[in-house]
């Protein structure tokens, strides 16, 4: 954290007072940097705290030169802190009646540089280096407990957010070394609640998450322009949802295991649509196919083809019959129009292939594998103060 400038923290009124007090009673101890409570600046209390602190110091550590502490800050943490200020939400309590000390190195090799309260607990803004694992923390402590901060891991992952009982808890952000980002809710060290995942290929998920898995309602956007909004089970599109692309094609209905399955409506970009039953991504069951400005077929379907009994409606004709694999094999009735004036070749047709194929969406399997490792995010217990 470095030495603080008293004119910035205490105000110019006290700058000369700190520099010119010569008596032993009032001259600040050289191991102090600044008292943070400018409204009750009292050098006697200042030195009383110094004496109490230094009488306890041998029990848990020793002073360390600020330069030596700076040498311990990992390069990834130092670079990130230079480029990004620590933004502390207004809801995070910060005790201003604290004292900023020189860095303290504990017996286990860990180092803390920052503020302490009258009870000799870490309190306020501080930085913490953990020897084991080369872990570095910058954050806010409250009476000895880390409650908000940034944790820099040796593998270049970074967490920034709220912390409770030494775990991610509340609002936070995880930046992974592969460029992926999660921002949202955490509970007891796990990704639980609502949040946003941004994957390295540009795919974005927003919605409900349970222990690192998409679970419940959410939205996903691919860089191709395809979007899905609906229910998820992991990275699987499940139950009810809507899938669209940038060209205007759209499916709205039921999904199962990344397939259209159950009842739904598929609309092509020209306005043609199929409304009815689907099975594993295909028109299968009862349904209506409305070929824009040409005809409407209502009846039985199998594997994206008319198959079974059906009725086809043209502008001047309505015909009932039987189809097999898309081919009319029997005409049972002309409800409208004269059979002599109708060319039967129009009874045989193929439907246009879907451009939206959910089980072939890019990186669904990769996304599922990626998020499996994002469930547990417990921070080390020794981030807390030495009692």
Question: Can you say where each PLM-predicted feature lies in the sequence?
Answer:
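Intrinsically disordered, low-complexity repeat tracts enriched in Gly/Pro/Ser/Thr and acidic residues
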Residues: 1-387
């Amino acid at each position: 954290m470095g030495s603080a400038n008293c004119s910035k923290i205490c105000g110019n009124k006290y700058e000369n007072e700190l520099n010119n007090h010569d008596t032993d009673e009032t001259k600040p101890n050289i191991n102090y940097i600044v008292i943070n409570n400018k409204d009750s600046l009292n050098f006697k209390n200042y030195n009383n705290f110094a004496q109490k602190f230094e009488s306890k110091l041998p029990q848990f550590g020793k002073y360390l030169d600020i330069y030596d502490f700076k040498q311990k800050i990992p390069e990834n943490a130092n670079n990130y802190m230079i480029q990004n200020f620590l933004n502390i939400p207004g809801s995070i309590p910060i005790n201003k009646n604290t004292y900023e000390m020189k860095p303290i190195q504990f017996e286990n090799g860990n180092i803390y540089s920052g503020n302490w309260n009258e009870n000799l607990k870490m309190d306020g803004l501080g930085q913490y280096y953990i020897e084991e694992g080369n872990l570095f923390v910058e954050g806010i402590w409250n009476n000895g407990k880390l409650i908000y901060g940034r944790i820099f891991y040796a593998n270049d992952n970074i967490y920034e957010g709220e912390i409770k009982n030494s775990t991610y808890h509340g609002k936070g952000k995880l930046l992974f070394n592969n460029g992926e980002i999660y921002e949202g809710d955490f509970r007891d060290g796990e990704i639980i609640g609502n949040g946003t995942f941004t994957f390295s290929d540009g795919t974005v998920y927003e919605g409900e998450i349970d222990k690192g898995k998409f679970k419940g309602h959410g939205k996903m956007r691919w860089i191709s322009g395809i979007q899905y909004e609906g229910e998820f089970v992991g990275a699987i599109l499940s139950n009810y949802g809507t899938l669209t692309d940038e060209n205007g094609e759209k499916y709205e209905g039921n999904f199962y295991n990344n397939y259209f399955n159950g009842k739904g409506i598929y609309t092509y970009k020209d306005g043609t649509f199929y409304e009815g039953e689907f099975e594993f991504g295909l028109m299968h069951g009862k349904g209506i196919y409305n070929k824009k400005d040409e005809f409407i077929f209502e009846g039985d379907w199998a594997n994206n083809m008319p198959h079974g009994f059906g009725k086809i409606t043209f502008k001047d004709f309505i015909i009932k019959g039987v189809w097999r694999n898309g081919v009319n094999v029997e005409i049972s009735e002309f409800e409208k129009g004269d059979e002599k004036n109708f060319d039967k070749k129009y009874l045989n047709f193929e439907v246009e292939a879907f451009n939206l194929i959910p089980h072939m969406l890019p990186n669904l399997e990769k996304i599922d594998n990626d998020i499996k490792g994002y469930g547990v995010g417990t921070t080390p217990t020794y981030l807390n103060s030495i009692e």
